[in-house]
């Protein structure tokens, strides 16, 4: 008893002389306590999970199988167990890749469940039909992957066709808008031309030309014929000669010729 007291006293004096070592020992003790608490908490959590699983298991419907049928059951093959292990590890990596709290504890629980399941699979026996199904899991998975890849390629081709159709539709929409703009410009030009024609001809609602009114001075002014006749001394003789000339056969022939010429010009 005195030896233990001397040893503890010696350790106390060493820690007193070396405070850094004392601090390191305290950190080691704290880390050990933390590890013990974590392990204890994990064990309690696993017990809770196990009890919860048993509670759920009691609610499941149990199926009785004849002993003679169990004789044909076979243990899982190593390839099937390796495949299950690979699949579970892939799921674990996917879960742990996310940013989640208490990742170490979750990883510990998941690894524990994985190892427990793999241990059960080593001694597990299944019917031959189930064995074939588990053996064909890899083949079925490859078939589903190939089908998914084919679907993705089909969707990619469909997306390319949709993009082309959208591009063609946008081009046609642009052409239609351009034609609408041209039609609008032409319509405005036609309206301007119609207004210009109306202004030139000055057509009123009755269809009669709206000519400017003549002044009273213009109406009262002598005609050009009267002015010319006023310059001729012998007006009656001149009018008589013009009447004879107008009624002569040569003048009539000339008038007929001119009329025929106008008719031919109009016909052509």
Curated annotation (Swiss-Prot):
This protein's UniProt keywords: Centromere, Chromosome, Coiled coil, Nucleus, Phosphoprotein
Subcellular location: Nucleus; Chromosome, Centromere
Recorded coiled-coil stretches: 170-203
Chain intervals for the UniProt region annotation (Disordered): 1-31
Pfam family, one: CENP-Q
GO CC terms, sorted: chromosome, centromeric region; nucleus
GO biological process, alphabetically ordered: metaphase chromosome alignment; positive regulation of protein localization to kinetochore
Domain of life: Eukaryota
Signal peptide start-end: none
Residues with the Phosphoserine modification: 31, 249
Alphabetized PANTHER family for the sequence: CENTROMERE PROTEIN Q (PTHR31345:SF3)
Annotated family: Belongs to the CENP-Q/OKP1 family.
Protein purpose: Component of the CENPA-CAD (nucleosome distal) complex, a complex recruited to centromeres which is involved in assembly of kinetochore proteins, mitotic progression and chromosome segregation. May be involved in incorporation of newly synthesized CENPA into centromeres via its interaction with the CENPA-NAC complex. Plays an important role in chromosome congression and in the recruitment of CENP-O complex (which comprises CENPO, CENPP, CENPQ and CENPU), CENPE and PLK1 to the kinetochores.
Subunit structure: Component of the CENPA-CAD complex, composed of CENPI, CENPK, CENPL, CENPO, CENPP, CENPQ, CENPR and CENPS. The CENPA-CAD complex interacts with the CENPA-NAC complex, at least composed of CENPA, CENPC, CENPH, CENPM, CENPN, CENPT and CENPU.
UniProt protein name: Centromere protein Q
